[in-house]
């Protein structure tokens, strides 16, 4: 099993945070993750994206065809929709426009539901990272807005998350 998820939007919208939240939840669930961060624009508001690959086996790269696109703006769909698989899922802005800085948390919640992961693991991760009720509410709103598509089962793999820098430093 392998899934590729693109998270795209304007610089400064919390794209990396979505990837961090979802990666933490997936690792807790026993899945291997690989995150590619694209930085074409360092100017706030320019287009940025991450591709998060998920697998039940070790992985060391991303794939070009996408199973899910999280679009934090319309430009993301214009640029990346051509790479979406025919049965792929798009998580857009519908119903989330009023969330402001919690848009990314809501979209992370929506993705966790699409993946078929238990809401409690999501809420525990949100509480661990943000410590506020608004973020919890946004995550729940996102989760409740979607239907399950992939039904990931909890695995017994014991995995930790490391950045490339951490891995190099540890040898």
Language-model region placement:
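Active-site cofactor/cluster-binding pocket
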Residues: 1-171
